[in-house]
């Protein structure tokens, strides 16, 4: 009987700790790579919506903007872009900032579009090169590209 009692206590303890262990294991580092800009508002907003959803679920999220997507951090674009069924970019962006999401902006793409340091001023963002994108992709568990 003592062995059964110890086994029972062990099982109860394991079942008590299991949800915390499973919950911790289900949290991932997610990288969202965005290449669509204001010319494809639904795709652009969808990328931010997926990032926001992941952050809301407690995942660690990073967003890398490249190509046409670098303009998405311009204040006028943040304030005006809305996707069809994917929400307003400003609302998603504000939620991402509140969740502590870091933004990486392709320095080459920004330079090609005459976007300088003012683009990321007062934003949780930094310019990055392709090498940084590759490093981020290897550091994260999952990568989504829009």
What do these predicted ranges mean?
Residues 1-11:
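Bacterial N-terminal signal peptides that target proteins for export
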Residues 32-45, 77:
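Short, glycine-rich nucleotide/cofactor-binding loops
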Residues 24-25:
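Boundary of Sec targeting at the N-terminus
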Residues 37-40, 68-72, 103, 109-113:
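Solvent-exposed loop/turn segments at secondary-structure junctions
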Residues 125-146:
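C-terminal partner/receptor-binding element of secreted or periplasmic proteins
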Residues 44-82:
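N-terminal, post-signal-peptide region of Sec/Tat-exported proteins
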Residues 81-107:
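A glycine-rich helix N-cap at a beta->alpha junction
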